[in-house]
A protein has these predicted regions:
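Short loop/turn positions at the edges of beta-strands in beta-sheet-rich folds
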Residues: 10-12, 31, 52-54
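Asparagine-centered strand-capping/turn motif at beta-strand->loop junctions
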Residues: 2-12, 62
Length: 96
């Protein structure tokens, strides 16, 4: 396994949502924020698959050993931000 890092930057003028599966974890990124995932990916083949749901949501499927995955937002630990949405009503999933 190779230690791998993948980052996503929100360059939009509104929040975006990134789900990391299989767990699931989901992060709301404010404009300008960067989410970085760090995990043990396979030495060969795809390290990650990314599915775009729409222009504000994507789903990330890391391959390899992701049990000890690190989640960083702007280079700071961010696991506590998973499912902590400011702009989305958790009951309906609609943006506020």
């Amino acid at each position: 396994m190779a230690r791998t890092q993948q980052s996503f930057v929100n360059r939009k003028d509104k929040p975006i949502y990134i789900s990391v599966e299989m767990w699931p974890e989901c992060f709301e990124l404010e404009p300008g924020e960067k989410l970085t995932l760090i995990w043990d990916a396979p030495d060969q083949g795809e390290a990650v698959q990314i599915d775009f749901v729409n222009d504000l949501e994507l789903v990330v499927w890391p391959n390899g050993n992701a049990e000890d995955m690190q989640f960083l937002i702007d280079d700071k630990p961010a696991r506590s931000r998973s499912w902590a949405f400011k702009h989305c009503d958790p009951a309906t999933g609609n943006l506020r």
